[in-house]
Structures are given as C-alpha cells and as structure tokens.
Amino acid sequence: MDINKVLKERQKWFEWKNIKPIYEKIVQWQIENKQLNVKNVKLNDIIEITLDENKEKLKEIEQIAKMLKPWRKGPFKINDLFIDTEWRSFIKWNIIKPHINLENKDVLDVGCNNGYYMFRMLEMNPKSITGFDPSALFNLQFEFINNFIKSDIEYKLLGVEHIPFYDKKFDTIFCLGVLYHRPDPITMLKELKAGLNPGGEVILDTLIIEGDEEIALCPVRYQKMKNVYFIPTLKALYNWIEKAKFKDVKFIGKRYTDLEEQRKTDWIEGESLNNFLNEDLTKTVEGYPPPLRVYLKLKN
C-alpha cells in the first residue's frame, strides 16, 4: 500500500461541500493570525488557552469554533469561550495516565479525534506524537486548537489498517474506543502490533460485556450505532489478544460510561448517551447491557 498516495487522495476530502467552507475559513484564519498573542496554555483536564486579543478577534474565534461542531472530545477553554464537548475526556485520561510513561518515546494515537489526548500527552515529553483519524472535520478541529498550542504533533487522515504500511514504528500506540467498530478485531490487534517497536506497548480501551464465558455480543445496533461489530467478555478479549500474539496483558481498570462522562451539550448536534439508554440507564435502548469499558496495556 502506498501511504503517500492514500494521503494525497484524502486531501480531496477537504473539497466536500460540507467541509470546504470550514476548511477555507480555517486556512484563511491561520494565514491572518500567525502572530496571535497566546499568553498561556494549560494542559489540564480542561485544556485552557489564554489570549491577549481584542473582542473582534475573540468573536471570530468563537464563530469558527461553532462552525466546527460537533465537538466530541475535550473540553477546551479559550479565554471566556468554553467548548463543553460531549465527552469529558479527562475521565478516561485520568484512568490511563498513572500507567504510562511517554518520556522520549514515539507515540501514535489511532482514532485521535480532535487531538485532545495528544495534547494531554505533551506534558509527558514524548519524542514525537502522531495521530491517525480518517475525519476531515476532526482534523480541522485539531488544526484550530493547535494554532494556539503550536505543537509538533503530526495528524494524518489514516486509519488502523494503514499502520503496517506506515514508514515509522512506535513505542506506544493508543487505541481508545476503536476495536468494537472493526469487523475483524483480531486482524486489527495484529495491525496495532505491526506498528510497534520491539518492547513497545498498546494502550487499549474497548467495550466489553460482563460474564465468565469466552463469548462476544454481535448486535445489529448497539446504542443506536450500526458500526458496532463485536463486544466481548474480558476472557474473549484476552483470547483475541493472545491470537494476535502479544506477549503480555496488564489490566488497568474498567468503568461504566455514565452521564458524567458523556452527555448532550450545546456543542454537538443530535443525541447522546441519555438517548441511547433506557429510562433507568440499566440497558441500551436495544435491551443490551450498558456500555462498560476496559482499559488494558498490551506488550509487544
């Protein structure tokens, strides 16, 4: 597979009629605002950016942020503008953070969305950070935020299937909330492994169901999503990982997704978690167990 050819083809995505106006606005805004006066950046649970700019500039920033909806991962704050994203992504990050060391490592985040987790990684002083996500909109959200942070993070319009063909290997690969969207989870785990340096690790977050059997749920829809293929028990997931030939697995934790972590805000369109569960939040609208996520560290 020719990755450069793939990337060149995907640049055409910015010409899509729903993306082109936003893309052109972002490009023009970046050209006109190369010298934005960024006073401070705090890479905390809320990524806070403080600017010393006039009201007109700040109003334009707010308009662009609203053009970029829906905002899934975050939150972000730019002066008084609070981008209250659907997910409070720091909840997941704070589960993972005590179990990782990214100092001087080459890091990949697969399914990186708008880059929230990559921005949080910066405080750990990695050697490099690369993000893969085949979404033009999320890429533009990243470019918007990175215009203030000015990191060296590389964002590629690629997916997990491109990892074995990419011209770089990584010490740590983050794969958060992707596995259940793939029709062949064992192949995907092998693709992640193919992207690791010797001794490298994958930080994996995925949906599971409770139970002692080595089985997986295969729903037509799950939380109204058509693109959920398999949700295994933990034992079945460990079997997948063994079949993908990882040497070791460390259990980090598990957590039910709740309305503290994911909810409807003014920064998304449509529905959120409360619309995907029944009234007492004990099952999905389809009658399946509610979303339970497990966090694992896989060693190459």
UniProtKB/Swiss-Prot annotation:
- PANTHER family for this protein: TRANS-ACONITATE 2-METHYLTRANSFERASE-RELATED
What reaction(s) does this enzyme catalyze? carboxy-S-adenosyl-L-methionine + 5-hydroxyuridine(34) in tRNA = 5-carboxymethoxyuridine(34) in tRNA + S-adenosyl-L-homocysteine + H(+)
Q: Which organism is it from?
A: Nautilia profundicola (strain ATCC BAA-1463 / DSM 18972 / AmH)
Q: Name one GO molecular function term.
A: transferase activity, transferring alkyl or aryl (other than methyl) groups
Q: Does Transferase show up as a keyword for this record?
A: yes
Identify the EC number(s).
Answer: 2.5.1.-
Chain segments annotated as coiled-coil in the UniProt record? none
User: Which protein is depicted?
Assistant: tRNA U34 carboxymethyltransferase
Instruction: Indicate yes or no for the key word Transferase.
Output: yes
The Swiss-Prot or TrEMBL record describes its family as follows: Belongs to the class I-like SAM-binding methyltransferase superfamily. CmoB family.
Q: Which NCBIfam families match?
A: PRK15068.1, tRNA 5-methoxyuridine(34)/uridine 5-oxyacetic acid(34) synthase CmoB
Q: What InterPro entries does the record point to?
A: CmoB (IPR010017), Mo5U34_MeTrfas-like (IPR027555), SAM-dependent_MTases_sf (IPR029063)
Pfam families documented for this protein: Methyltransf_9
Q: Name one GO biological process term.
A: tRNA wobble uridine modification
Q: List the disulfide bonds.
A: none
